[in-house]
């Protein structure tokens, strides 16, 4: 092994990642598993394969890799797969923008369609659904190759023979299999119900995909008339007036008790609607009486259900007013008014409705400006609407107390890191307002394996679904034909039609334990790794990925899919805002990795405590710079020890780390050396316990503190003795270097592998994790006082603006318990270049110092 005169970090990533991959040191070998306890399995988050990874991915995936490397060194057979989430809206949008295409399911498939990147919406071309899906797969595969390159450069110890995708045939087969299982058990069902709807994407949205944003709006006070009085209501959505089906007030509100059971007439549209009591009405909100529309918000849905109101939808899937007036509008005046709204966007409809209200003097006073929370699809830019639609659902405990209690119990059975994250899971579960909506009106996704019989006119009979035989999976019902039918019966009277909706991406991602573990293809593998040891993930998807995975596992296996879960925090920009691609403040990791190296970036990630948000200023990444300095110091320290042993006659050529075990304790006799090893024992124990509890930050800090003390103090103190060939010093240096490289290996794998290679031909990442030496001799206080001595001497020279090489003729120094360091005063005097030294018991300080040549 050629050891450079000046060690460098440049090129280590390419050198070692290639060797690791070719030697397959991270591959999971099922035949090596003799018992479940031998395995440590990780349900790795599959990153969304749409564009580029950002620095937040590097942050959280490093945390997982540290644990994987630690468990491997602990003797576990680690199952560490990698998946690609290439299914869903992000991929669709990327393909639309990249190729400038739009999917039109009515178009025929075009064979051998080849498109290049265009990025020009004005040139958008319509293509068939099948062609669109092929482009999605093509671009996803290109993105996945880039992702794999970055993960390899970062040093993830992933088993690249264990990869999966969320939209390939295996994923479709698995998702369809478990969907049919859920249908058979009653866990999955179809319903026509109010649905949260994104008008931009034209798809239903689940509760877990919603975020609230503060929006500026106005309260408008409208006048409704009854036979004896005017009733005033306040609303932020006058455009929904045509869909009003009732007014509601709290049953104890004396202002409106006399109206309960009566009717009022809506302004402009002249619809007669009832006034009803309901305890969800808020007397202190607005005028205290509310307009019920179908539907303005979730409360409207509650009132509609509880009061058994009629539905009067006026918004279509594109977010425009429907073409025909709803049935309750019967007056000629009302129908004429509605005709002027037909086809308008909601913002235009609001403006025009207000104009009509003003013209008939049904607006009272001036609008009142407010800021209020409005629900959005997390990927959308327009407020969500609520439409009556047919959708597929999976029961999640919303209306089943026994299931809720079971899911809470499964959550409590997990080891949560940090523990506080359990409260988020429980809070989400107890705050559900619907079952889990799993169908989407999109193009890319797992098809529902369903057809429907048609009636005499060719209309789908949704109450008569046709399900396939399990042996026919995977399938696309828009291409495949159900058994007993022929293709010419598709869409024909008394024939069949395919379900065109696809499954929500979480309906597939919720099955990553089964998908990565090849539940259908390799039962022995799945048996060996399930339940998984760990699910690492972000805190923002507890309500989606984690919760949905527990639901699916409970239905499939009656258990939680993992034993523990580790939740990472967010990466914040310098303004303390969460970095995300959607907000445009996310930084790609390539530049910073190229500039500082993978080990430095991993160090920065490891310094953050699990679950805690961490800020990053990419222009001045202080911790990353510190990490680079640490990695270089590891190389320089190892080089120093190697050369010491090469220069010793008893060693020929390359020192062998194996020589350290079993340790010849008889060779380690110096009190300072024994004190250092005692402190090393403490470091091993603390670092090991920290990593077992997923506290990588504490483990790194503990080891790093010991290492810098070793380099800055111990090495300087024993250097002369080591150069002189002292066996105690040389053995101690070799032992400590061995162990420190191992302790740092999970954090900075490249520098530690390089340093290890100078001593041994094996990989440090296949070595056993260090165990405490359990020394019976050695006083840990000795090293502490010796370090204090050296710190005072250095400080004195620095204060006098002298070189550290300046000799001291006489030193009088006070230290607590100075007699402890008397046996090593020769080492200390040589290290500090001191001729005469007088020790005094007291608080640590220099009492007198005279600089001058040492008498020789």
Swiss-Prot record:
A motif ('KMSKS' region) lies at residues 578-582. InterPro entries: aa-tRNA-synth_I_CS, aa-tRNA-synth_Ia, Anticodon_Ia_Val, M/V/L/I-tRNA-synth_anticd-bd, Rossmann-like_a/b/a_fold, tRNAsynth_Ia_anticodon-bd, Val/Leu/Ile-tRNA-synth_edit, Valine-tRNA_ligase_type_2. Pfam families: Anticodon_1, tRNA-synt_1. It catalyses: tRNA(Val) + L-valine + ATP = L-valyl-tRNA(Val) + AMP + diphosphate. Its EC number is 6.1.1.9. PROSITE patterns: AA_TRNA_LIGASE_I (PS00178). A motif ('HIGH' region) lies at residues 47-57. GO terms for cellular component: cytosol. SUPFAM superfamilies: Anticodon-binding domain of a subclass of class I aminoacyl-tRNA synthetases, Nucleotidylyl transferase, ValRS/IleRS/LeuRS editing domain. Its main location: cytoplasm. Transmembrane segments: none annotated. One of its GO terms (molecular function) is valine-tRNA ligase activity. It comes from the Bacteria. It is found in: Cytoplasm. One of its GO terms (biological process) is valyl-tRNA aminoacylation. Catalyzes the attachment of valine to tRNA(Val). As ValRS can inadvertently accommodate and process structurally similar amino acids such as threonine, to avoid such errors, it has a 'posttransfer' editing activity that hydrolyzes mischarged Thr-tRNA(Val) in a tRNA-dependent manner. ValRS has two distinct active sites: one for aminoacylation and one for editing. The misactivated threonine is translocated from the active site to the editing site. HAMAP family: Val_tRNA_synth_type2 (MF_02005). This is Valine--tRNA ligase. It comes from Tropheryma whipplei (strain Twist) (Whipple's bacillus). The lineage of its organism: Bacteria, Bacillati, Actinomycetota, Actinomycetes, Micrococcales. The gene is valS.
